[in-house]
């Protein structure tokens, strides 16, 4: 059913015939999957297909986690390698950032007993905070705000208060699209505001995204393109795309 959600995410609507053709399944299987997803309130059934109850970015994070999972794991390891013991790290929400939090938890040097935190993570994602709180040597700071029910991210002015009073060594920000000309973009303007502020409070701001987002744009920009200094992505980025980002001033790390 994840594959059906992926198709739905592309255009916001899907027909049974499309599912049959693209996924090589029977019409009965396609209808059964649509009915099951409708029962979970992930889509609305129509005659001959379905429409999304929300646009692609609003699909619950548990369904987005499986998309490009190997790439996200490699990106997470590359991101973790940039972090030094004792750093203050900003982590916005999203599946790639969640993978980075997992990579932090697997680092032996961050699990060593210490009178001071081996790492401080500032996040607006409650799922990431819940994951890291199990690591006693990692200090977890939550921004505050109102929970976005599908992405688990905290948004709103309460987040601004916390972020406005701290400094961050390195921030990792996931995106819905990145383009050399338009920069980084996300679908939700409230999340964009938090991501942008976190990047501005950081000495180094890093975009983490799989290559499927390259060349795409979403609704809300994350400030000026020069706000970020590094892009970490997977090895499906083309040579032309990499050159375009490097010409725009971004360091590109291929995981």
Where are these regions (language model features)?
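Short, Lys/Arg- and Gly-enriched loop/turn segments at beta-strand edges
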Residues: 100-101, 217
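HTH-adjacent hinge/linker in prokaryotic transcriptional regulators
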Residues: 1-17, 21-95, 101-121, 134-137
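Conserved phosphate- and dinucleotide-binding cores of soluble alpha/beta proteins
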Residues: 3-19, 24-28, 39, 71, ...
């Amino acid at each position: 059913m994840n594959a059906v959600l992926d198709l739905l995410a592309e255009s916001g609507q899907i027909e049974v015939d499309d599912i049959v053709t693209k996924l090589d399944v029977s019409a009965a299987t396609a209808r059964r999957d649509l009915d099951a997803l409708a029962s979970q309130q992930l889509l609305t059934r129509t005659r001959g297909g379905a429409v999304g109850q929300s646009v692609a970015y609003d699909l619950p994070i548990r369904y987005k986690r499986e998309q490009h999972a190997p790439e996200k794991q490699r990106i997470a390891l590359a991101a973790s390698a940039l972090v030094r013991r004792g750093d203050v790290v900003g982590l916005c929400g999203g599946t790639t950032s969640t993978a980075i939090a997992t990579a932090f938890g697997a680092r032996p040097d961050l699990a060593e007993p210490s009178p001071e935190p081996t790492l401080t993570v500032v996040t607006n994602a409650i799922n990431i905070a819940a994951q890291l709180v199990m690591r006693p040597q990692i200090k977890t700071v939550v921004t505050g705000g109102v929970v976005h029910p599908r992405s688990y991210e905290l948004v709103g002015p309460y987040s601004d208060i916390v972020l406005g009073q701290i400094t961050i060594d390195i921030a990792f920000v996931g995106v819905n699209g990145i383009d050399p000309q338009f920069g980084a973009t996300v679908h939700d303007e409230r999340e964009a505001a938090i991501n942008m502020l976190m990047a501005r409070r950081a000495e180094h701001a890093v975009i983490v995204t799989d290559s499927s987002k390259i060349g795409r744009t979403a609704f809300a920009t994350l400030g000026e393109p020069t706000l970020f200094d590094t892009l970490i992505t997977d090895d499906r980025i083309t040579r032309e795309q990499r050159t375009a980002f490097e010409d725009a001033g971004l360091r590109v790390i291929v995981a």
